[in-house]
Regions:
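Core segments of cupin and vicinal oxygen chelate
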Residues: 29-72, 106, 113, 129-131, ...
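Residues that flank catalytic or metal-binding motifs in active/ligand-binding sites
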Residues: 23, 62, 69-71, 93-95, ...
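Short proline/glycine-enriched turn/loop motifs at strand-loop junctions of beta-rich domains
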Residues: 101-105
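Conserved short beta-strand elements that form part of the metal-binding/catalytic scaffold
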Residues: 2-11, 49-88, 138-152
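Generic preference for hydrophobic/aromatic residues in regular secondary structure cores
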Residues: 73, 106, 121-123, 127, ...
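N-terminal beta-strand motif that seeds the catalytic metal site of vicinal oxygen chelate
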Residues: 8-38, 44-50, 94-99, 149-154
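A cross-kingdom feature marking solvent-exposed beta-strand/loop segments within repeated
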Residues: 16, 54, 80-89, 93-95, ...
């Protein structure tokens, strides 16, 4: 589909000491058919590491996490009356970039203090993984959505 993602590791390393950034967390990809997409990535060597759903005002959001050699994909399919063709989504097939943080509350306060364009005005929680996760999102300089994510350990 022409989407290209490049991660600059050296720049992320120098930023990590300031914000508790631990590194890459996952890349979220929107899909029309979750099962077909999961089968495709399984064929490439990815294994399912988590799944679930979230009811939203737009419909039910089905989510699957698949991992291969430390790289995690979040596959997303929205089912419901407000669903439109993924080819018309403004952000393309790649929904967001997610970064793993040590303390999501500290990262949130730092993002606000730096004047980043906040997409979420508070920290959200999802009942995914063993103990859930907490996250918030900002917009990058090109309109890309960047999620700061902390997976709860207990």
């Amino acid at each position: 589909n022409g989407d290209v993602v490049e991660i600059c590791y050296d720049n992320a390393k120098s930023y990590a000491g300031k914000s508790g950034l631990l590194g890459w967390d996952h890349l979220a990809v929107r899909t029309k058919d979750l099962k077909e997409t999961m089968a495709f990535y399984a064929g490439l060597g990815f294994n399912m590491t988590g799944n679930g759903y979230l009811d939203t005002p737009d419909g039910r959001l089905y989510i699957a996490f698949m991992t291969c050699k430390g790289f995690t994909l979040e596959l997303i399919q929205l089912v419901g009356p407000a669903v439109n063709d993924p080819d018309t989504w403004k952000s393309g097939k790649i929904d967001h970039i997610s970064l793993d943080v040590q303390n999501v509350q500290d990262a949130f306060m730092e993002a606000r203090s730096k004047g980043y364009e906040m997409v979420d005005f508070g920290i959200k929680e999802l009942p995914l993984f063993d103990h859930g996760c907490r996250f918030f999102t900002i917009k990058g300089p090109n309109g890309e959505i960047i999620e700061f994510n902390q997976i709860n350990k207990f």
